Every structure is written in structure tokens, then in C-alpha cells.
């Protein structure tokens, strides 16, 4: 994907990145400062308090986004790709950690990924609600319609997902640029009237606020975290745009405009403390209120689209790495490989978002649910990056600790602050995260047990090939057996002999191997092995972001083996495993039932590997775990 970024000019790529990478963090001014003061119950809106909270916001943006993500985390790339799954795969490949201890690192990666799924539910709900709530500033007439309008926008957004964002996507960058410039202009207009607000850049205001209000600071931090939501996106989308355009957009457009807008809202509060009701929209001149509401709604839809696309992409990576069951994945663009649509996840997200809006009703209520997911994800990133720096960059442990501990302490404080809101909404991301982690861990463990059972109970392939001789009837044609255990005889082959009493002239065992890299070079795609006159073994290697097309890869394999390739003379034999519970070591009964249920509902192998259905023969088998 980085090739696309390289072909385009740097400013054009930075503009495109604005619409995808910064949509989430760009909509934070709609609610972040308001929630920071709401969190500080009873704290007067005096100048020292306004400047103190603004200073905390500014330095959180600088420390967490500018230094941690932009300067450090974005250097921890997996062959150009970013995101928590890519970082986990990179660490599993590079870190010299005992297998029995890798489970802890996998758990951290799973927790971070699971919370991102939660983010995909909470972000559209809070963003769209906060934008539409601007209508209540214009007139009370709209008050009863805020929720229905927000739900209608969300439903429309999810209905068009199957068509992909390609058509409207080209407008995302320019619209988001106008949005950020609007934020900056509104801020400048207010700051000029009350320039004393620029004192927020001095850290002494933050230190003074923390010193005089230590308990209140803890509550305020739980809302200040809303200003850094979307920081993960800078890293997660790095593979699409490259680090340079993202850094360019951040330092030259996003950061200045965000800081100016927060300063402008603070200046407004210094002039009129009553504006705390909704400092963002009260910053807007009356004549520009409706255009700004429309612009804010467009910005939140773009932010939501970016998060939804991120969830689809993360799910695809998890599926290909073997952490999630196969789901149906549709490609919505012929030219852009990364534009995908996952129907099951699409409708699941839509239902969950509507339920959230109906339960919480306002963006202020949802803010409690939002912060905890963000802070925990950031903490997971910090831990995994520390492992990466130690193992890949070969830094000494003291040096790593000196770099990482300040971020770890800051984010631990943010986690603690947002944890205070568990009862008022923080339970939402925890519940979503717990469900997602359970699914990820159960599927991974279930697959391990299944493959171990197959390896243990099935005949060795080498022994089978040596002993088969001329005891079976050979029929013309090629039989391709898809198998995850290349060293044993596939169940489908055994069933073919048992029921049909035949073997094909050419029996080809194909195993798909997913590497811990985003993409595998075409020349490294295939390894082939001739086992005997009638038997061949092929391994096809893909990265976790590669397009998987087995028939296409087989053309290359046949060429290496010196065989004639004709898809219409190839039969693909696939074993449809039926998993059943057995007494003994393994998983707890409820996890086995969950795994069996997921196994039954996986997308067909033929769809996943793009094998024509008219060339597929499915044979059932039963495996006890």
C-alpha cells in the first residue's frame, strides 16, 4: 500500500491522510473541553483553572501524540505497516522470548485489538451525536429529534459500506482540511479577543493546577484523554500513507488547528463562563452556526468511516493470522486492495452503535464509555513498543525504561482516571473488550488443539506415500488437497480412498502459511516439493495483508514443478471438519462449545481462498478435542 503513497506527491498524500488518519482526533474539540470541566464538579471557571486545564490538554497532545506516537511508535513498523496486530506479529518474530511467555505478549496484543473493536462502536456514536447536538444550540425545536437524526445518519453510513468509500473517499481529505482550517480560524478569532489564554503553553499552569487540585486533576484527566482519541490511527494507517505525509499533516495542519481551537474555547470561557454549556458551538458566530453543524456532521461521518474501515482491516489481519474465524470479506474496489467490506461485522457494529445511542442518549453520557478504551489501548501500545525497542533496536534495559516509564506513568494515570467511570459507562468498552478477547483466545487455542489432534491421530504422509504402491486405482486429473497439516495425510484424501477407492494421477497437498509480515514478495510466495511420482507438496506464503488467491498461486507452483496448469482439470478437495467435545485436557466445556459454534459458522474455505465453487469437493470429518 505504501507504493500508492510514493506515487502521489507528498502534499497530496498528506491531504488524503487528513481524511483517514485524523478524523477521530479532529472531532474531539466538539466535546473534549466541555467534558473536562464537567468532570471537575464544583470547580469554578476561574482563569487559573481554565489555563490549567488547557495547559494539561496541550501537554498531553505534545507528549502522547507528538512525541510518543509520531516520534517513537511510528518508527516501530512491520515492513512499513503499523497497528497493534502488525506490532504484535513483529514482536513475535523479533523478540527472543520463550514460547510459554509469548502468551502474555499475545494477550496484551489481543486486549489492545479488542479495545479497538470497542472503539469502532463508541466513536461513531459519540462523534455523530456531538455534531447533531449543535442543533439544540440553534433552537430548542430540534431537541426531540437529536437521537433520531443521529441514528438515521449512522444507518445511512452503514448501508453504503458495501459499496466501499472509493467514490466519496476522494472528498474526505479536502473536507477534513476545511474542517481543520475552520477549527483554527474560530480559535484565532477568539484568542485575538482574549490573548491572555496563550499562557496555556507554559507548563507552569498545568503544574500549578495539579498542585492545588490533586484530587480534581485525577477526575479532569479522565476527560482530557478525549483530546488524544484517535492517536492509534496515526500508527495504524502508516502502511497506507507512509510516515512522512502523516507527520507533515500532524505538525503543519492538525496540531496547530486543534491547539488554536482549544485555546479559542478557553478564551471564550474566560470571557463568558456560562459558555461551558457547549463552548465549541458557542464559539461559532450565529450566521455560521448551521453551516458549522453540517461541516461537523460531515467530519464526524468521515471519522466514523475511518474507524469502521480500521475495524474491517484489523479483523482481516486477525483472520489471516489465525486469531479469528474466517469471515466473508468483500473487496469494494478493483484498484485499492485495502478497501474491504465485512458484512457480518458491518451489521454487528450498526446494531451495537444504535443500542449505545439508545442507552446513553447524549454525547456527554457516552464520554464516560469512551475514555477507558482509548487509555487501555495506548497502554498496550506502550508495552509492545517497549518490547520492540529492547528486542529490535537492541537498546539496553535501563535506556528503554528511561524512555518508556514517563509514558507508562502518564497513561497509567489516565487509565486510573477513566476507571472511575466504569459504573457510568466505562463498563461498555470493558464488556466489548472481554467478549472480543475471549473469542480471539478461544479460537487460537481451539485451532492449536485441532492441529495437534490431526498431527497425532493421522497417518504420516511420508509413510503413506511409500506404502501406497499400486494398491489403488489411479484416475486422470489433478487433486489438490487443502491442508493445515502438511506432514500428515489429509482427511479428505483418506476419505477419497475409503469411499471412492481411487487416487488421482497427481495429488497435490497445498498448505497456506501466513507470515508475520504484511506482504510476501512474489518470488518468495511458493515452495514446492516432489514426494513421489504421484505426490507433490506445495506451501503458499502470504503476509497478513496480502490478497489470498490459491488458484493464482498454483499457476506459479505448477510452473516451478514443470507441470501443465489447467484449472478445469483440477479438483480441490477440502475437509469440512466437525469438531466434537471429548473428555480430557483441552479447554473448559464452555470454551469448547464456543469454539465449535465458531467453527460451524466460518466462511467456506473456497470463498476465503477464491477457489471456484464448481471445482470444489467437500468431504466431512470428525475431530475430537
From Swiss-Prot:
- What's the gene? kup
Is Lipoprotein tagged as a keyword? no
Q: Which keywords does this chain's UniProt record carry?
A: Cell inner membrane, Cell membrane, Ion transport, Membrane, Potassium, Potassium transport, Symport, Transmembrane, Transmembrane helix, Transport
Single GO molecular-function term?
A: potassium ion transmembrane transporter activity
Q: According to the entry, what is the taxonomic lineage of the organism?
A: Bacteria, Pseudomonadati, Pseudomonadota, Gammaproteobacteria, Moraxellales
Which Pfam families does this chain map to?
K_trans, K_trans_C
Which InterPro entries does the UniProt record give?
A: K+_transporter, K_trans_C, K_trans_N, Kup
The record's subcellular locations are: Cell inner membrane
Q: What is this protein called?
A: Probable potassium transport system protein Kup
In the bilayer, the protein is annotated as: Multi-pass membrane protein
Cited function: Transport of potassium into the cell. Likely operates as a K(+):H(+) symporter.
Amino acid at each position: 500500500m505504501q507504493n500508492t503513497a510514493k506515487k502521489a506527491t507528498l502534499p497530496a498524500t498528506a491531504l488524503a491522510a487528513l481524511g483517514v488518519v485524523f478524523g477521530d482526533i479532529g472531532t474531539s474539540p466538539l466535546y473534549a473541553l466541555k467534558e473536562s470541566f464537567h468532570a471537575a464538579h464544583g470547580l469554578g471557571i476561574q482563569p487559573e483553572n481554565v489555563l490549567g486545564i488547557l495547559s494539561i490538554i496541550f501537554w498531553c497532545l505534545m507528549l502522547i501524540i507528538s512525541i510518543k506516537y509520531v516520534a517513537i511508535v511510528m518508527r516501530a513498523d512491520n515492513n512499513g505497516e503499523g497497528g497493534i496486530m502488525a506490532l504484535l506479529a513483529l514482536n513475535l518474530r523479533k523478540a527472543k522470548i520463550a514460547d510459554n511467555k509469548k502468551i502474555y505478549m499475545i494477550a496484551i496484543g489481543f486486549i489492545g485489538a479488542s479495545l479497538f473493536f470497542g472503539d469502532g462502536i463508541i466513536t461513531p456514536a459519540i462523534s455523530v451525536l456531538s455534531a447533531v447536538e449543535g442543533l439544540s444550540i440553534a433552537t430548542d425545536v430540534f431537541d426531540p429529534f437529536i437521537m433520531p437524526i443521529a441514528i438515521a445518519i449512522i444507518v445511512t453510513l452503514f448501508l453504503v459500506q458495501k459499496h466501499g468509500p472509493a467514490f466519496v473517499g476522494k472528498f474526505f481529505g479536502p473536507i477534513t482540511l476545511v474542517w481543520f482550517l475552520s477549527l483554527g480560524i474560530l480559535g484565532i478569532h477568539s484568542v485575538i479577543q482574549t490573548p491572555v489564554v496563550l499562557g496555556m503553553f507554559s507548563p507552569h499552569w498545568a503544574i500549578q493546577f495539579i498542585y492545588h487540585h490533586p484530587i480534581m486533576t485525577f477526575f479532569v484527566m479522565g476527560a482530557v484523554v478525549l483530546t488524544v482519541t484517535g492517536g492509534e490511527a496515526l500508527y495504524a494507517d502508516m502502511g497506507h500513507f507512509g510516515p512522512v505525509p502523516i507527520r507533515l499533516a500532524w505538525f503543519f495542519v492538525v496540531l496547530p488547528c486543534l491547539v488554536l481551537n482549544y485555546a479559542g474555547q478557553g478564551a471564550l470561557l474566560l470571557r463568558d463562563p456560562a459558555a461551558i454549556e457547549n463552548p465549541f458551538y458557542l464559539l461559532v458566530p450565529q450566521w455560521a452556526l448551521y453551516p458549522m453543524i453540517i461541516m461537523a456532521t460531515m467530519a464526524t461521518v468521515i471519522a466514523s468511516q475511518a474507524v469502521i474501515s480500521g475495524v474491517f482491516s484489523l479483523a482481516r489481519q486477525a483472520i489471516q493470522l489465525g486469531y479469528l474465524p474466517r469471515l466473508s470479506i468483500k473487496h469494494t474496489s478493483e484498484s485499492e486492495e485495502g478497501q474491504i467490506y465485512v458484512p457480518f461485522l458491518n451489521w454487528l457494529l450498526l446494531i451495537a452503535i444504535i443500542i449505545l445511542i439508545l442507552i446513553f442518549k447524549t454525547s456527554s453520557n457516552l464520554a464516560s464509555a469512551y475514555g477507558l478504551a482509548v487509555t487501555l489501548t495506548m497502554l498496550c501500545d506502550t508495552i509492545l513498543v517497549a518490547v520492540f525497542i529492547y528486542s529490535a533496536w537492541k537498546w539496553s534495559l535501563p535506556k528503554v525504561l528511561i524512555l518508556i516509564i514517563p509514558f507508562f506513568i502518564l497513561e497509567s494515570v489516565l487509565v486510573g482516571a477513566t476507571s472511575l467511570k466504569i459504573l457510568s459507562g466505562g463498563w461498555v468498552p470493558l464488556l466489548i473488550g472481554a467478549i472480543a478477547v475471549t473469542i480471539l483466545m478461544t479460537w487460537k487455542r481451539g485451532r492449536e488443539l485441532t492441529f495437534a489432534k490431526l498431527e497425532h491421530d493421522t497417518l504420516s504422509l511420508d509413510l503413506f506415500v511409500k506404502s501406497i504402491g499400486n494398491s489403488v486405482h489411479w484416475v486422470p486429473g489433478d487433486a489438490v488437497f487443502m491442508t493445515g497439516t502438511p506432514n500428515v495425510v489429509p482427511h479428505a484424501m483418506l476419505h477419497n480412498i475409503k469411499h471412492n477407492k481411487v487416487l488421482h494421477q497427481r495429488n497435490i497437498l497445498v498448505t497456506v502459511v501466513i507470515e508475520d509480515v504484511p506482504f510476501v514478495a512474489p518470488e518468495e510466495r511458493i515452495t514446492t516439493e516432489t514426494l513421489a511420482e504421484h505426490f507433490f507438496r506445495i506451501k503458499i506464503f502470504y503476509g497478513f495483508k496480502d490478497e489470498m488467491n490459491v488458484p493464482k498461486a498454483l499457476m506459479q507452483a505448477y510452473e516451478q514443478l514443470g507441470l501443465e496448469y489447467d484449472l478445469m482439470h483440477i479438483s480441490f478437495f477440502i475437509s469440512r471438519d466437525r469438531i466434537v467435545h471429548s473428555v480430557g485436557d483441552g479447554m473448559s466445556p464452555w470454551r469448547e462449545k464456543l469454539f465449535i459454534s465458531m467453527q460451524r459458522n466460518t466462511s467456506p474455505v473456497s470463498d476465503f481462498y477464491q477457489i471456484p465453487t464448481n471445482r470444489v469437493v467437500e468431504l466431512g470429518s470428525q475431530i475430537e478435542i
